[in-house]
């Protein structure tokens, strides 16, 4: 550097650049000294040559500029530092100069010690500093900033215009001061004292300093003045709005020093959201505010500004202390570097920088705030998530260390973190990408290595001390090696020798580091396992402490009730720690095994093959054989034995419902099935009385049995016999010829009377049930219609074979039959739900040259509907149209009823509207009743009541079936609870019989409301009428207790009593079912033994055919059977008394006698169904009611534990089970991880498919867990099921996943698919409407009409409106005058005016009287 060049830039050594020359303050004048600078020129020249290209950026190193995440020798991902030089190379100089001038002027005013001339000089010098040329102005703050990672250059830090020296500079500076400034010794001494203090602080700062800590000089700490500048705010906001145009946007940012831009932005963001710091740092320590350097510093500095100039030194000291404390406490956490992802351009094993591997239980969060603020609000407040990342990288971990992978989405994909629903909990470790630190840096300084050694990692376990000591030893070895390298450089070796020597050392160190890293990995794995175990122990202890419940609450647990179950020996159970295990004991019926096992296996196979055929198929074959083959033994019909029970004359009730159509045009029967749920088990063996449920009720029932007159009649009002009395009065009025007005009023209400057609129809059929074919044949008064009724009654009362034999007898005796005979025979297909047999009978009708009528097709359609073949039913409907067979309201009613039974409720309503609008069908009582049943399934109580009012307005008779269906519909709605009892009173007032279906719906109404008082009254009414309680009723009784616990007014003791009552019902069910099954097994076993004996007899008879020995053989067999039967009974009793005796091994097989009763027992056991256990009475619906009971009692863990016991009762959870648990976990527990786990269990382990409601709830929970993997999984599930999110959910997904391209693409594809589906549906609906209109038009053309042709109804309507218009016109005219008598309009106006002659004639002038003339 020559002299001219030096003195041309001598202006740089003004008061602003006091970093590199010494000055003394005396009487407001400054004496500069440049001797120190000249002496140390060579050292600065080397630094200028070496670092001249490093202004305002991190050092550009090929290998050191890369950060690799690797496992062993495999590089998982590489990151590169931000190149600030490229970003700020073309900065706006004018704005930078203007801003620097402003900053310098502010600093000068704060000191109050600089003259105006010096200010101008400083401005000139500062303008030159803005240039990027390689000159002496390089010796500025930028050269010695913290971004220069070097050990040879020590930076000088200035805090509030106070000088701090390095260790090597102090001695030289003191000597220079003594030589040059000898006059002011007193000031020098004071100044040296300050230097000593400042040097001590500076040394401590350098030792404790972090490598990535940004320079904190006076200009950066005075940025609060520039924070208020709106230009800077705009530039900061625009900086983080985009990613791709960052280089151009950086031109707008104005800074004093280019490399401090990140520091300024962070300070500005901290200043901007200081009010939110308390909210985000609520989980940290209370004293954490002390760690925040900037806000507290600014506050104190602003307070100190108001003081006098004499207190400036005190303020400066306070600021220094404040800054020193902040540095000391935040040295390990204040990380301000930024990384971006690059390709793997360095695949060598000798890499310079490594990341420590992360924990296995790592979790990823996708939102800026974990449940603390709404997502949409944060998205509106922040335009980009980059601001959140900046905050998150500060000292304070404001967002619980979340990974914002929405912006850094490639990180989690590269590392491959597994997202499992089990790990989605709040207590799991969550890491922040911005806080990832390097393991060990080869090119790091001594200060960094010491800091790494002193850095403490917060382990919970003491065993992790091994890891710390190993780390310290490794770093010491590295220090020794690097120290040798530095000493070699000091000795004066050349650069090439130094490079060769350093390369060899690096290779040696890398080899050592690889070995040490392998050892550290093994140690880390062991320590992680120990930590996981200890964490589990600590968590279990914490959970136990938190979940301490009272003794009363523990007694309510389901495991305590299940331990008390007393079950039949064959199904004995043992419960261990709440988990149910079934251990089946040995059956007493199996006494011993046979010696000859081969013979036994052969016989077992034969009987198994015969038993594989279902009973329904056997019946079909029998009936088909009887129908197609005319047996010769038809005379022996009387001797045919039927297994089915005989008809009870008085108390028998049909499951099916027959309604007679009373029109004269046709006589037929329309069969409507009772509206029952699919899960109801209406078996006679499971029907039982309610015993032991309520002790008080049992006592009252005994009281009722003693006195018939004091029966409790249930919920009945005093007006129950109103209609009966009214009918009696009407008959009396008719006899006595009372007033016709009274009779008319009575007839209105009598027509309103509800008919009981079901019982009347059953009474008619019961007359023929006990009659015989020959009795009717002997009586000459019976015709073919009576034969038809006989066949129909036999079929409807479960005697199908007898009905078919009677049909063959009709053919045998040439009795003339008609199509109705075949129709009566075809009712067998409806009873047995056999569509195949119905088609065979239809073919036989055509073969016998009979023409099928509409009743035939109605029965065919009904048979196919009951066989769950709705498509074939509609094919038959179209066949009727093609063959021009009349389709009346009965066919339409049957088709709509079939759609409802196949759960096509929407299609049923559409078909009803079609026949009413386009076919001009007028609904009757039956069709309205069917539509009310459809409303019951859809829970549309309002529409049901509308149908009821329509029936009343059309004077249709409302039968008992209609009332029962109305009660069924209203019982499913809680808000119509009292309306249910209104119709129940109407039912009772008409003296209709109380049946089981009605009581079921009344119990359902009580269960939905949770009204136990009304439930007791219903149960008493059932006991009075001797109606048995079914399993479905027990389910709703338990549900009544569950819904009763919803009320907040219910106390804890009442809730516990409800749980006890519910389990008491289950005890009664299990005991009753086990007792009844014992009897059933004994009966079935006796029947099976008798059959087996008969077969054995036939075998012996075939072997010994001789007629002479027949009697002897029969006697011999009977004797042997009696003997063996007695032996079997004795051995059974003996074994039951002594089950552990050796008599179990006794053989009961006799070689001379081939009949083995043990074999009979063994074969009988093989034919038993697996479901015939004592748990048959407990179904899924009862267990669902128990889960609901625990949920409403707020015992959520017990509700989840109930899933374990489904397998114990041999049940499978259904849709309602999972729906209740999903709602509980999401809305009440808010445990979104368990929601995802339960959904995974439902999909993989059950056959339940999610619907729209469940999938939307699962999607919300996946978003709440802040996992993109789970969110994408649920969205794909919705896409496959063609269930689409709502517009609100789409908007939420857009904001949440705006940086995940897969989510955006999937949402777009779902929107496109949804539009396609909706378009196709609308197109089909429009085509169907167009088709219906065309069909209606064609039907009009057949009649010779068009749309414009008027029907009689249209003509009558037109006449009515014409007459109405004429009447309105006549009202406008004057009374008794025609339109021709009207006055002209002008005369009319004059007559209305007041005044004038016309008015005087009318009003004013009195006229003379007649007698005056």
Swiss-Prot record:
The keyword Repeat applies. Residues 282-315 are annotated as: Disordered. InterPro entries: Pentatricopeptide_rpt, TPR-like_helical_dom_sf. Keywords: Merozoite, Repeat. GO terms for cellular component: cytoplasm. Possible candidate for an effective malaria vaccine as determined by epitope response in sera. Residues 299-308 have a biased composition (Basic and acidic residues). GO terms for molecular function: mRNA binding. The keyword Repeat applies. PPR repeats lie at residues 783-817, 818-852, 853-887, 888-923, 924-958, 995-1029, 1179-1213, 1214-1245, 1251-1285. It holds the Pfam family PPR_2. Belongs to the PPR family. This is Pentatricopeptide repeat-containing protein 2.
């Amino acid at each position: 550097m020559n002299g001219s060049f030096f003195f041309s830039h001598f202006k740089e050594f003004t008061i602003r650049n006091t970093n590199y020359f010494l000055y003394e303050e005396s009487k407001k004048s400054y004496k500069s000294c440049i001797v120190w600078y000249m002496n140390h020129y060579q050292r600065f020249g080397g630094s200028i040559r070496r670092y001249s290209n490093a202004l305002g950026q991190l050092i550009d190193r090929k290998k050191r500029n890369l950060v690799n995440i690797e496992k062993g020798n495999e590089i998982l991902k590489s990151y590169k530092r931000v190149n600030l030089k490229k970003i700020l190379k073309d900065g706006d100089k004018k704005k930078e100069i203007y801003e620097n001038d402003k900053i310098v002027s502010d600093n000068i005013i704060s000191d109050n010690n600089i003259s105006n001339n010096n200010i101008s000089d400083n401005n000139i010098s500062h303008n030159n500093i803005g240039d990027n040329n390689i000159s002496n102005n390089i010796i500025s703050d930028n050269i010695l900033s913290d971004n220069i990672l070097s050990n040879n250059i020590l930076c000088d830090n200035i805090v509030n215009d106070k000088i701090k020296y390095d260790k090597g500079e102090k001695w030289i500076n003191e000597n220079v001061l003594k030589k040059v400034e000898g006059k002011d010794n007193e000031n020098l001494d004071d100044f040296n004292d300050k230097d000593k203090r400042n040097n001590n602080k500076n040394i401590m700062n350098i030792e404790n300093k972090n490598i990535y800590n940004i320079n904190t000089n006076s200009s950066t700490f005075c940025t609060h003045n520039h924070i208020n500048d709106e230009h800077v705010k705009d530039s900061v906001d625009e900086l983080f709005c985009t990613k791709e145009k960052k280089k151009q946007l950086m031109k707008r940012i104005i800074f004093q020093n280019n490399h401090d831009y990140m520091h300024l932005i962070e300070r500005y963001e901290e200043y901007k959201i200081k009010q939110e710091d308390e909210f985000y740092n609520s989980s940290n320590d209370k004293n954490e505010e002390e760690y925040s350097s900037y806000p507290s510093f600014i506050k104190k500095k602003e307070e100190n500004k108001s003081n006098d100039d004499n207190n400036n030194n005190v303020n400066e000291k306070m600021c220094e202390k404040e800054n020193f404390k902040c540095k000391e406490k935040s040295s390990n956490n204040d990380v301000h570097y930024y990384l971006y992802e690059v390709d793997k351009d360095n695949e060598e094993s000798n890499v310079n920088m490594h990341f420590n591997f992360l924990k296995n239980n790592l979790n990823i969060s996708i939102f800026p705030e974990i449940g603390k603020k709404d997502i949409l609000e944060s998205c509106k407040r922040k335009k980009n998530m980059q601001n959140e990342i900046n905050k998150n990288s500060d000292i304070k971990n404001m967002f619980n260390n979340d990974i914002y992978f929405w912006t850094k989405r490639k990180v989690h994909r590269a590392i491959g973190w597994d997202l499992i629903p089990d790990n989605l909990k709040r207590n799991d470790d969550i890491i922040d990408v911005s806080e990832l630190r390097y393991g060990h840096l080869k090119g790091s300084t001594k200060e960094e290595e010491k800091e790494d050694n002193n850095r403490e990692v917060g382990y919970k376990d003491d065993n992790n001390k091994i890891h710390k000591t190993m780390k310290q030893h490794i770093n010491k070895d590295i220090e020794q090696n690097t120290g040798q390298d530095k000493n070699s450089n000091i000795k004066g070796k050349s650069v090439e020798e130094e490079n060769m020597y350093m390369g060899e050392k690096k290779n040696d160190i890398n080899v050592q580091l690889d070995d040490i890293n392998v050892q550290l990995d093994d140690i880390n794995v062991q320590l992680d396992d120990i930590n996981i175990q200890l964490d589990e122990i600590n968590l279990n202890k914490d959970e136990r402490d938190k979940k301490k419940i009272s003794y009363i609450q523990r007694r309510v647990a389901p495991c305590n009730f299940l331990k008390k179950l007393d079950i039949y020996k064959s199904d004995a159970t043992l419960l261990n720690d709440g988990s149910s295990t079934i251990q089946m004991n040995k059956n007493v019926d199996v006494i011993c095994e046979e010696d000859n096992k081969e013979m036994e296996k052969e016989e077992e196979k034969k009987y198994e093959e015969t038993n594989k055929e279902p009973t329904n198929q056997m019946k079909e074959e029998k009936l088909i054989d009887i129908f197609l083959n005319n047996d010769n033994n038809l005379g022996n019909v009387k001797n045919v034995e039927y297994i089915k029970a005989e008809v009870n004359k008085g108390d028998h009730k049909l499951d099916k419902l027959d309604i007679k159509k009373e029109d004269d045009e046709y006589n037929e029967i329309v069969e409507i099935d009772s509206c029952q749920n699919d899960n109801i088990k209406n078996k006679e063996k499971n029907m039982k009385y309610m015993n032991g449920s309520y002790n008080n009720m049992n006592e009252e029932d005994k009281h009722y049995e003693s006195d018939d007159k004091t029966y409790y009649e249930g919920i009945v009002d005093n007006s129950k016999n109103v209609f009966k009395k009214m009918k009696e009065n009407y008959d009396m009025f008719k006899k006595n010829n009372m007033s016709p007005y009274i009779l008319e009023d009575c007839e209105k209400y009598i027509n309103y009377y509800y008919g009981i057609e079901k019982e009347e129809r059953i009474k008619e059929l019961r007359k023929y049930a006990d009659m015989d074919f020959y009795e009717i044949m002997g009586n000459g008064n019976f015709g073919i219609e009576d034969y038809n009724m006989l066949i129909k009654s036999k079929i409807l009362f479960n005697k199908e074979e007898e009905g078919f034999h009677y049909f063959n007898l009709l053919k045998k005796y040439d009795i003339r039959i008609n199509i109705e005979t075949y129709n009566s025979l075809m009712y067998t297909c409806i009873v047995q739900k056999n569509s195949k047999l119905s088609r065979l009978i239809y073919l036989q009708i055509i073969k016998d040259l009979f023409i099928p009528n509409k009743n035939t097709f109605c029965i065919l359609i009904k048979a196919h509907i009951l066989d769950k073949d709705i498509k074939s039913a509609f094919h038959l409907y179209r066949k009727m149209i093609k063959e021009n067979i009349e389709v009346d309201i009965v066919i339409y009613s049957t088709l709509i009823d079939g759609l409802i039974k196949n759960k096509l409720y929407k299609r049923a309503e559409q078909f009803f509207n079609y026949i009413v609008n386009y076919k001009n069908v007028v609904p009757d009582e039956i069709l309205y009743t069917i539509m009310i049943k459809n409303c019951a399934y859809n829970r549309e109580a309002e529409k049901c009541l509308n149908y009821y009012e329509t029936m009343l307005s059309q004077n249709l008779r409302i039968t008992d079936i209609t009332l029962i269906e109305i009660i069924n519909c209203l019982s499913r709605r809680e808000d119509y609870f009292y309306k249910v009892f209104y119709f129940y009173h109407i039912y009772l007032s008409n003296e209709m019989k109380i049946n089981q279906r009605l009581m079921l719906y009344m119990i359902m109404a009580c269960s939905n409301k949770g009204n136990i008082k009304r439930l007791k009254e219903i149960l008493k009414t059932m006991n009075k009428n001797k109606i048995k309680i079914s399993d479905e009723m027990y389910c709703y009784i338990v549900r009544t207790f569950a819904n009763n616990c919803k009320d907040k007014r219910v106390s804890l003791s009442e809730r516990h009593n409800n749980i006890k009552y519910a389990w008491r019902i289950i005890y009664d069910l299990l005991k009753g079912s086990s007792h009844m099954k014992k009897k059933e097994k004994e009966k079935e076993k006796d029947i099976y033994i008798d059959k087996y004996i008969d077969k054995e007899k036939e075998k012996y008879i075939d072997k010994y055919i001789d007629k002479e020995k027949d009697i002897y053989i029969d006697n011999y067999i009977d004797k042997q059977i009696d003997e063996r039967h007695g032996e079997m009974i004795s051995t059974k009793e003996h074994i039951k008394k002594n089950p552990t005796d050796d008599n179990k091994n006794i053989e009961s097989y006799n070689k001379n006698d081939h009949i083995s009763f043990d074999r009979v027992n063994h074969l009988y056991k093989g034919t038993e169904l697996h479901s015939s256990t004592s748990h048959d009475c407990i179904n899924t619906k009862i267990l669902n009611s128990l889960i609901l009971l625990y949920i409403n009692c707020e015992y959520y863990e017990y509700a989840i534990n109930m899933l374990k016991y489904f397998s114990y009762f041999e049940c499978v959870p259904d849709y309602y089970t999972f729906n209740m648990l999903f709602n509980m976990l999401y809305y009440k527990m808010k445990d979104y991880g368990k929601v995802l786990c339960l959904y995974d269990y439902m999909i993989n382990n059950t056959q339940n498919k999610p619907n729209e409601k469940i999938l939307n709830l699962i999607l919300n929970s996946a978003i709440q867990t802040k996992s993109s993997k789970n969110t994408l999984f649920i969205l794909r599930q919705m896409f496959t099921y063609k269930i689409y999110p709502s517009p609100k959910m789409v908007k939420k997904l857009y904001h949440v996943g705006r940086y995940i391209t897969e989510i955006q693409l999937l949402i777009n594809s779902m929107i496109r698919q949804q539009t396609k589906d909706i378009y196709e549906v609308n197109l089909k609906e429009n085509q169907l409407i167009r088709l219906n209109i065309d069909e209606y038009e064609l039907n009009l053309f057949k009649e010779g009409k068009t749309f414009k042709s008027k029907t009689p109804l249209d003509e009558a309507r037109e006449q009515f409106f014409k007459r109405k218009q004429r009447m309105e016109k006549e009202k406008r005219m004057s009374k008794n005058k025609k339109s021709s008598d009207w006055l002209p309009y002008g005369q009319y106006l004059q007559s209305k005016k007041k005044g004038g002659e016309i008015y005087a004639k009318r009003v004013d002038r009195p006229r003379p009287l007649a007698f005056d003339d």
